[in-house]
From Swiss-Prot:
Domain (C-type lysozyme): residue spans on this chain: 19-147
Family to which this protein belongs: Belongs to the glycosyl hydrolase 22 family.
Upper taxonomic lineage: Eukaryota, Metazoa, Chordata, Craniata, Vertebrata
Protein name as catalogued: Lysozyme C
Pfam family, one: Lys
Annotated localization: Secreted
Oligomer status and interactors: Monomer.
Known EC number: 3.2.1.17
Physiological role: Lysozymes have primarily a bacteriolytic function; those in tissues and body fluids are associated with the monocyte-macrophage system and enhance the activity of immunoagents.
GO molecular function, one term: identical protein binding
Anything else known: Lysozyme C is capable of both hydrolysis and transglycosylation; it also shows a slight esterase activity. It acts rapidly on both peptide-substituted and unsubstituted peptidoglycan, and slowly on chitin oligosaccharides.
Length: 147
């Protein structure tokens, strides 16, 4: 029993860091944070992007060949948008540590995503959105959700 308690206490901090959202749960959180129709992109676009970027996992990270890393539910890149302390020449245009993008609270990710989408490329900045969501019926991603 004591070893089980020690094991639980060791993994407890990891559980607090990230979260895998349900589709409708994420849609509701994104809507509450102002992403529905942000810069003309419907909520379904954002949910679709999150599905194919991170599979709705706030703790997702992916290392890129250029040495940068993508972080969080929308896989925001450390070369341009956040500071992870290890990406050479990082611009940190969202002025946040990349670790903030791994939280179960997606506020930092959404605020940074708004800055990214406000740039000249809009949601085209997300490769997964371009390849998997753009031009598709993205309303399907929020169908059946009570929003």
């Amino acid at each position: 029993m004591r070893s089980l308690l020690i094991l639980v206490l060791c993994f407890l901090p990891l559980a607090a860091l990230g979260k895998v959202y349900g589709r409708c749960e994420l849609a509701a959180a994104m809507k509450r944070l102002g992403l529905d129709n942000y810069r003309g992109y419907s909520l379904g676009n954002w949910v679709c992007a999150a599905k194919f970027e991170s599979n709705f996992n706030t703790h997702a990270t992916n290392r890129n060949t250029d040495g940068s890393t993508d972080y969080g539910i929308l896989q925001i890149n450390s070369r341009w948008w956040c500071n992870d302390g290890r990406t050479p020449g990082s611009k940190n245009l969202c002025n946040i540590p990349c670790s903030a993008l791994l939280s179960s609270d997606i506020t930092a990710s959404v605020n940074c995503a708004k800055k990214i989408a406000s740039g000249g490329n809009g949601m085209n900045a997300w490769v997964a959105w371009r390849n998997r969501c753009k031009g598709t019926d993205v309303h399907a991603w929020i169908r059946g959700c009570r929003l």
